[in-house]
């Protein structure tokens, strides 16, 4: 699988998912859910599995649904893919994503 790194914001997204899942459903569910998310992120970074090309919004941007979250990733030649956001399906995805891509 292709390597990837998380931006600080995506890392904060992941920490929030872990906290919420642990609080609501316990440690065992955290392990299961995060394992599925990590597999989905790795597939997206490698360009495998179903994903949506979001290049019209931002050059090379990819999006894939992983469980109840959407992952946004920028592949980079010769470097690990950059995960810019991991957002819950009920969030205003485009508004939150636009804020991330400005910087």
Curated annotation (Swiss-Prot):
It comes from the Bacteria. Disruption phenotype: Loss of this gene blocks plasmid stabilizing ability. Keywords: Plasmid, Plasmid partition, Toxin-antitoxin system. One of its GO terms (biological process) is protein heterotetramerization. GO terms for molecular function: DNA topoisomerase type II (double strand cut, ATP-hydrolyzing) inhibitor activity; protein homodimerization activity. Belongs to the RelE toxin family. The keyword Zinc does not apply. Probably forms a homodimer in solution, interacts with ParD, possibly as a ParD(2)-ParE(2) heterotetramer, which neutralizes the toxic activity of ParE. The heterotetramer binds DNA, but not ParE alone. Plasmid IncP-alpha RK2 is maintained at 5-8 copies per chromosome. Gene3D superfamilies: RelE-like. This is Toxin ParE. Toxin component of a type II toxin-antitoxin (TA) system involved in plasmid partition. Acts by inhibiting DNA gyrase, converting supercoiled plasmid DNA into a singly cleaved linear form in an ATP-dependent fashion. To do so it probably interacts with one of the gyrase subunits. Gyrase inhibition is prevented by antitoxin ParD, and is reversed in vitro by incubation with ParD. In cells that have lost the plasmid filamentation and growth inhibition occur; this is suppressed when ParD is supplied in trans.
């Amino acid at each position: 699988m292709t390597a990837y790194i998380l931006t600080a914001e995506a890392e904060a997204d992941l920490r929030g998912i872990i906290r919420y899942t642990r609080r609501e459903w316990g440690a065992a569910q955290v392990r299961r859910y995060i394992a599925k998310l990590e597999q989905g992120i790795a597939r997206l970074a490698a360009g495998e599995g179903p994903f949506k090309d979001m290049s019209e919004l931002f050059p090379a941007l990819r999006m894939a649904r992983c469980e109840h979250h959407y992952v946004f990733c920028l592949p980079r030649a010769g470097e690990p893919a950059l995960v810019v956001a991991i957002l819950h399906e009920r969030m205003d995805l485009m508004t939150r994503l636009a804020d991330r891509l400005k910087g």
